[in-house]
Curated annotation (Swiss-Prot):
The modification N-acetylalanine is found at A2. Keywords: Acetylation, Membrane, Repeat, Transmembrane, Transmembrane helix, Transport. The gene is MPDU1. Belongs to the MPDU1 (TC 2.A.43.3) family. This is Mannose-P-dolichol utilization defect 1 protein. It comes from Cricetulus griseus (Chinese hamster).
Length: 247
């Protein structure tokens, strides 16, 4: 029995999904109704699933822009504010030594969001501005991750995520409303972001216990829900130039 308990199954689960006490509780004593350990297992599993999914979540958006050779319908201000919010989460989480499963997707989404920023600028004819933006962003990121940056500054950056998320999503919602369609906005990306932010409310409470982190995801879920609702509402709407081509 001891050999089974110390087998490869345990070596995979214990460092990744469960503390040893919970592994013993669930898989040695077979107590599958132990709520605290089940919460840990669910939170870690969801967290790792979100992190894995984040590797792909914005790729449909990137491919849609590349395929159309256009970023029509995407608000640059909204994308940049989302980049600010994601960067704040990454820096705050690293500074506070939060487990990677509780914030890892923010890192991958940051890389994909900066790519979208560059594509929007490129297809607007501002490629040089995009390169300058990337250089400035990298410099600022290194400065914020430096030990010389006060914790108060990092905390303030994370607190600014709420207005950044709200304003950014409202700008995108306003763009959609003004255009009467969602342009090159990817429905897959929008719905994945909505689902991920909802799941993150639970995992951030469970894994970090940080009300600031949880609050950001609550607000993010509401805003992502608004954009998702617009995607459904404008599902059959097409940009004017497409109507002209069909006529």
């Amino acid at each position: 029995m001891a050999g089974e308990a110390d087998g490869p199954f345990k070596r995979v689960l214990v460092p990744v999904l469960l503390p040893e006490k919970c592994y013993d509780q669930l898989f040695v004593h077979w107590d599958f109704l132990h709520v605290p350990c089940l919460k840990i297992l669910l939170s870690k599993g969801l967290g790792l699933g979100i992190v894995a999914g984040s590797l792909l979540v914005k790729l449909p958006q990137i491919f849609k822009i590349l395929g159309a050779k256009s970023a029509e319908g995407l608000s640059l201000q909204s994308v940049m504010l989302e980049l600010v919010a994601l960067t704040g989460t990454v820096i705050y989480s690293i500074t506070n030594n939060f487990p990677f499963s509780s914030w890892g997707e923010a890192l991958f989404l940051t890389l994909q969001t900066i790519t979208i920023c560059l594509l929007v600028l490129h297809y607007r004819g501002d490629t040089v501005k995009g390169v300058a933006l990337l250089a400035c962003y990298a410099t600022l990121l290194l400065a914020l991750l430096s030990p010389l940056t006060p914790l108060a500054v990092v905390t303030m950056l994370q607190a600014s995520n709420v207005p950044a998320v709200v304003v950014g999503k409202l700008l995108q919602a306003a763009t959609n409303y003004h255009n009467g369609h969602t342009g090159q906005l990817s429905a897959i990306t929008v719905f994945m972001l909505f689902g991920g932010s909802l799941a993150r409310i639970f995992t951030s409470v469970q894994e970090t216990g940080d009300p600031l982190m949880a609050g950001v995801f609550v607000v993010s879920s509401l805003c992502n829900g608004l954009i998702a609702a617009q995607v459904l509402f404008y599902w059959n709407a097409k940009p004017p130039h497409k109507h002209k081509k069909e006529q």
